[in-house]
């Protein structure tokens, strides 16, 4: 499944923690998950709360690893998310959807 998770920002505190991400849902295909972000479906941006999103392909299991990840940033002109390269602030982090 392809999980959509949004993040307020990418800043880490002194202990290395980020603000808690929010998983909005999942879809059976990447294309459908990407379409949800491209159209800001159900306002996953939440009127300005979330600046970043990640789509992760996660298989079933206990503590599964992300098999694929794509990063997105909110485009204020388009009022929707646009795909972006993996941010430099993200190092060896994964599985935002399930913790």
Model-derived features with residue positions:
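Short aromatic-glycine-(Arg/Gly/Cys) micro-motifs in beta-strand/loop hairpins
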Residues: 1-23, 49-54
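Terminal low-complexity, poorly structured segments
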Residues: 3-6, 33, 94
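Compositionally biased, low-structure terminal segments
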Residues: 4, 25-31, 51, 75, ...
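A short, charged, amphipathic alpha-helix used as a generic interaction element across diverse proteins
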Residues: 15-21, 27-50
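Short, mixed-charge low-complexity intrinsically disordered segments
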Residues: 39-99
């Amino acid at each position: 499944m392809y999980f959509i998770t949004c993040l307020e920002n990418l800043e880490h505190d002194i202990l290395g923690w980020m603000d808690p991400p929010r998983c909005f849902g999942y879809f059976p295909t990447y294309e459908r998950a990407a379409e949800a972000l491209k159209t800001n479906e159900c306002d996953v941006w939440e009127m300005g709360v979330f600046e970043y999103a990640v789509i992760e392909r996660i298989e079933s299991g206990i503590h599964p690893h992300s098999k694929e990840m794509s990063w997105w940033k909110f485009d204020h002109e388009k009022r929707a998310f646009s795909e972006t390269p993996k941010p430099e602030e993200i190092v060896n982090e994964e599985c935002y959807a399930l913790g």
